Amino acid sequence: MNNRVHQGHLARKRFGQNFLNDRFVIDSIVSAINPQKGQAMVEIGPGLAALTEPVGERLDKLTVIELDRDLAARLQTHPFLGPKLTIYQQDAMTMNFGELSAQLGQPLRVFGNLPYNISTPLMFHLFSYTDAIADMHFMLQKEVVNRLVAGPNSKEYGRLSVMAQYYCQVIPVLEVPPSAFTPPPKVDSAVVRLVPHATMPYPVKDIRVLSRITTEAFNQRRKTIRNSLGNLFSVETLTEMGIDPAMRAENISVAQYCQMANYLSENAPLKES
């Protein structure tokens, strides 16, 4: 028996497809999402509708984004979901969530069992639309969830941690074993809730500057920031900001990264691209 086949559909490796089939896990995720009629619910990667069906039962309308044309066609003809669905057969990485929110007339509630091969770039894509998003619930590789929630002074803490926590409150919801999927992935999974901050705790003047600083610091995470960020900040400047130049990227808090970004925006702003 081919364990990549589920409900007659062959899971495609290039799309990173693993289909959720554990009823307890599904019910737990739907309870965490708590969908309500009238909300602008958007599912990324509905697949074989493991979450789509129980969420759709509670709603009059549901928007889904599915790259796989065969799965999109199955959803179109679904006996009870079909009429409720607005289906975008496209890559979520190309979706303008700001325009979608404007069309639906309210902030989006986004959820999904995300393909692990695109989960990190998709997170960064969604962060650029947090003004249009009320909250997000995602099934991800457990390692990615650990990175999203990590604090300074841990090996999981990295650029993804800083950028996620800059934009959102990040809350782990539950852990999910490989046995909950067909085919079983080789890694553990977890569900995370991301709620965009209503008021930014550490506002930055130019997000591109924060992105640049975190990229340069974490690309050389074993170096002290005196070296990894030496092209941007002098030792004196770091010391004036109360940041020890002997620290490494993983020792610096989100607030401190934002402080550095604002200093750079004021003193050496990036040119408009």
UniProtKB/Swiss-Prot annotation:
It is found in: Cytoplasm. SUPFAM superfamilies: S-adenosyl-L-methionine-dependent methyltransferases (SSF53335). The keyword Glycoprotein does not apply. InterPro entries: KsgA/Erm, rRNA_Ade_diMease-like_C, rRNA_Ade_Mease_Trfase_CS, rRNA_Ade_methylase_Trfase_N, rRNA_adenine_dimethylase, SAM-dependent_MTases_sf. One of its GO terms (biological process) is rRNA methylation. Its main location: cytoplasm. Transmembrane segments: none annotated. SMART domains: rADc. Its EC number is 2.1.1.182. The keyword Ribonucleoprotein does not apply. One of its GO terms (cellular component) is cytosol. It is an enzyme of class 2 (transferase). Keywords: Cytoplasm, Methyltransferase, RNA-binding, rRNA processing, S-adenosyl-L-methionine, Transferase. One of its GO terms (molecular function) is 16S rRNA (adenine(1518)-N(6)/adenine(1519)-N(6))-dimethyltransferase activity. It catalyses: adenosine(1518)/adenosine(1519) in 16S rRNA + 4 S-adenosyl-L-methionine = N(6)-dimethyladenosine(1518)/N(6)-dimethyladenosine(1519) in 16S rRNA + 4 S-adenosyl-L-homocysteine + 4 H(+). S-adenosyl-L-methionine binds at residues 18, 20, 45, 66, 91, 113. Belongs to the class I-like SAM-binding methyltransferase superfamily. rRNA adenine N(6)-methyltransferase family. RsmA subfamily. Specifically dimethylates two adjacent adenosines (A1518 and A1519) in the loop of a conserved hairpin near the 3'-end of 16S rRNA in the 30S particle. May play a critical role in biogenesis of 30S subunits. This is Ribosomal RNA small subunit methyltransferase A. The gene is rsmA.
